[in-house]
């Protein structure tokens, strides 16, 4: 039934799929003798996306094409089209190399590990996590700042492979096709250009330790982890086919690129803007291996990362899209949370813009959006479970800026307005 024929509500329209009335949903779309609400449309889109993603994952006869990979990345990551293209091609080639590795021994295809360079909160980690989800391979993430050379206090490089093995549920064969993301690699840069009598165990020493596992070696991994169980039996894991993705903000790299010079500034097509007039992401796109060497990475480490992908700064429009558009967008997450209290949550356009502007002012990128949302909604989430009949909570610009309280719309009031109309 799409219409109610009883009493005052005889003209009320209902969704033909979930049965909700036009007052319970944001939009009701009419068709020939049927209606569908916006929530059912979103649910249908989610089902179609999941089926498409499953088709990509299960198509083992042919590795997903770069376009297919990029299309799924678009569902989760806003913007960064250049980085997505670079990653999609590199990952496609990597797994195609694994699939056809034994069919032609005349030409040996080398592994192409990836280096992601971009400001904080621009999506480096999310890109790596989404890639692993698309390909249905084990994935682990390591923080380079916690690593030290073997024999020193800190985490051994081999522990990265142990985490990957744990993600693969100790299936060595699956782990050997996994993806490792090493974050904060810019923090293990060489501390000084001049050799020192004190050993740099958390900088250049870690780079040296990572070389072998990134290039390909058989690592001996203790199943219980680390140095606490020296008598245990070791597992042998070949890292040749593990894809390593390294990421870092590389603060100050843009100054090194700027000091290198950008070639000629003469001619009609020349960009005559100074470094201060250009955005950081725009400058980082011109990075060369020599710039990374000046930053403090050793030549051998740079050589193990032949694929460079740079990410752009996120502007206000991009952050607004991140808040509302992806499949697991923050706004959708909080709306789902409020639905559990039988309450709808709505953000005005100027509220989303104000949240994005706050994140830019804090220089935290997309990573800072959740913290801002938590602060805005804290009092509401504290009070709401104890309130009755709150139908909707509305957040506007004044609420984000702390100049007003969220607007509570009660079910009785909405019904009174509807009956008087």
From Swiss-Prot:
SUPFAM superfamilies the record matches: Glucocorticoid receptor-like (DNA-binding domain) (SSF57716), P-loop containing nucleoside triphosphate hydrolases (SSF52540)
Record keyword Cell inner membrane present: no
Keywords of the record, alphabetical order, are: ATP-binding, Chaperone, Metal-binding, Nucleotide-binding, Zinc
Per the record, the domain of life is: Bacteria
Residue ranges annotated for the ClpX-type ZB domain, each copy included = 3-56
Q: Which residues bind Zn(2+)?
A: 15, 18, 37, 40
Q: Does the keyword ATP-binding apply?
A: yes
Q: What's any GO biological process attached to this entry?
A: cell division
* Pfam families associated with the record: AAA_2, ClpB_D2-small, zf-C4_ClpX
Q: Which GO terms describe its cellular component?
A: HslUV protease complex
- Residues that, per the record, bind ATP: 119-126
GO molecular function per UniProt: ATP binding; ATP hydrolysis activity; ATP-dependent protein folding chaperone; protein dimerization activity; unfolded protein binding; zinc ion binding
Q: What does this protein do?
A: ATP-dependent specificity component of the Clp protease. It directs the protease to specific substrates. Can perform chaperone functions in the absence of ClpP.
Entry-linked PANTHER family: ATP-DEPENDENT CLP PROTEASE ATP-BINDING SUBUNIT CLPX-LIKE, MITOCHONDRIAL, ATP-DEPENDENT CLP PROTEASE ATP-BINDING SUBUNIT CLPX-LIKE, MITOCHONDRIAL-RELATED
Q: Give the family, as the similarity comment puts it.
A: Belongs to the ClpX chaperone family.
Instruction: Indicate the quaternary assembly.
Output: Component of the ClpX-ClpP complex. Forms a hexameric ring that, in the presence of ATP, binds to fourteen ClpP subunits assembled into a disk-like structure with a central cavity, resembling the structure of eukaryotic proteasomes.
Protein name, per record: ATP-dependent Clp protease ATP-binding subunit ClpX
Organism equals: Paramagnetospirillum magneticum (strain ATCC 700264 / AMB-1)
Higher taxonomy: Bacteria, Pseudomonadati, Pseudomonadota, Alphaproteobacteria, Rhodospirillales
């Amino acid at each position: 039934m799409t219409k109610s024929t009883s009493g005052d509500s005889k003209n009320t329209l209902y969704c033909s799929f979930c049965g909700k009335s036009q007052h319970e949903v944001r939009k009701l779309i009419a068709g020939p003798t049927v209606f569908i609400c916006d929530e059912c449309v979103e649910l249908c889109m989610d089902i179609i996306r999941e089926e498409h993603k499953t088709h990509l994952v299960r198509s083992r006869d042919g590795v997903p094409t770069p376009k297919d990979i990029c299309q799924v990345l678009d569902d989760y990551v806003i913007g960064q089209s250049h980085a997505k293209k670079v990653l999609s091609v590199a990952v496609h080639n990597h797994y195609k190399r694994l699939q056809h590795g034994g069919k032609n021994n005349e030409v040996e295809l080398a592994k192409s590990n990836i280096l992601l360079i971009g400001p904080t909160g621009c999506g480096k980690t999310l890109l790596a996590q989404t890639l692993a989800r698309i390909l249905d391979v084990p994935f682990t993430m390591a923080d380079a700042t916690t690593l030290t050379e073997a024999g020193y206090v800190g985490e051994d490089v081999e522990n990265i492979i142990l985490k990957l093995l744990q993600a693969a549920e100790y299936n060595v064969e699956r782990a050997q096709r996994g993806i490792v993301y090493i974050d904060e690699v810019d923090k293990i840069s060489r501390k000084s250009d001049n050799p020192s009598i004190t050993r740099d165990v958390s900088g250049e020493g870690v780079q040296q330790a990572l070389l072998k596992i990134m290039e390909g070696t058989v690592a001996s991994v203790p199943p219980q982890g680390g140095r606490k169980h020296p008598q245990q039996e070791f597992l042998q894991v070949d890292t040749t086919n593990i894809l390593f993705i390294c990421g870092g903000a590389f603060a100050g790299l843009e100054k090194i690129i700027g000091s290198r010079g950008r070639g000629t500034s003469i001619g009609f097509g020349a960009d005559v803007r100074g470094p201060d007039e250009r955005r950081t992401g725009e400058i980082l796109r011109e990075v060369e291996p020599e710039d990374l060497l000046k930053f403090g990475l050793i030549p051998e480490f740079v050589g193990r990362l032949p694929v460079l992908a740079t990410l752009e700064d996120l502007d206000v429009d991009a952050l607004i899209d991140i808040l509302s558009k992806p499949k697991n967008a923050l706004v959708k997450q909080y709306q789902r949370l409020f639905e559990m209290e039988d309450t709808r949550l709505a953000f005005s356009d100027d509220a989303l813009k104000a949240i994005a502007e706050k994140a830019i002012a804090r220089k935290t990128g997309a990573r800072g959006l959740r913290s801002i949302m938590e602060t805005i909604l804290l009092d509401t989430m504290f009070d709401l479970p104890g309130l009755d009949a709150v139908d909707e909570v509305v957040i506007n610009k004044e609420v984000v800026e702390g100049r007003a309280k969220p607007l509570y719309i009660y079910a009785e009031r909405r019904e009174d307005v509807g009956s008087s109309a």
